[in-house]
Every structure is written in C-alpha cells, then in structure tokens.
Swiss-Prot record:
One of its GO terms (cellular component) is cytosolic small ribosomal subunit. The keyword Ribosomal protein applies. Belongs to the universal ribosomal protein uS17 family. The keyword Cell division does not apply. The gene is rpsQ. Part of the 30S ribosomal subunit. Keywords: Ribonucleoprotein, Ribosomal protein, RNA-binding, rRNA-binding. This is Small ribosomal subunit protein uS17. It comes from Streptomyces avermitilis (strain ATCC 31267 / DSM 46492 / JCM 5070 / NBRC 14893 / NCIMB 12804 / NRRL 8165 / MA-4680). One of the primary rRNA binding proteins, it binds specifically to the 5'-end of 16S ribosomal RNA.
Amino acid sequence: MSESNVTETNEQRGFRKTREGLVVSDKMDKTVVVAVEDRVKHALYGKVIRRTNKLKAHDEQNAAGVGDRVLLMETRPLSATKRWRVVEILEKAK
C-alpha cells in the first residue's frame, strides 16, 4: 500500500475573518446585531474617521445581551443577511 492511496482526512479550512464589536440589539431569537467600528484615516486631510458597520451574528445559546463586547467569526451564510457567528463574549455589560 502506498501513501498516495490514503485520503487526506484533516483538510484545512480557508482563512476566516474575525471582528470585535458591541451588541446593539438582541431582540431576535438566536441572532444579535453587532456594531463593528472601523477607524480610517482620511487620505488627504489625515483626520481619523470612525465608520460603524452593523452585522447580524448567530448566537446559539442567546447568551449575548445589549452592551456586551463580543468576538465574531465569519461563517457560511445562515440566512439572507447573517454571515457571522458569536465565538465568545469578551465583556458583559454592566
């Protein structure tokens, strides 16, 4: 038996993006809306601009609440607008 006949069982997944953001809504079942802030420097004037993007993320246990800081990871499309999932809750709201 040669090594070439053995199939590769542990295939590598592609690189998945991670984002950190603040939960702004948890009213949907197993879904949270997370505001992810991006700071961009203006090309001409050099001023730092804050850009916010709202992402819908899958939260299987409904553990995240409004005001929590969460870590998101990119995943396959789970619905029409949901392409992220909550990996962990970094900080609970006070």
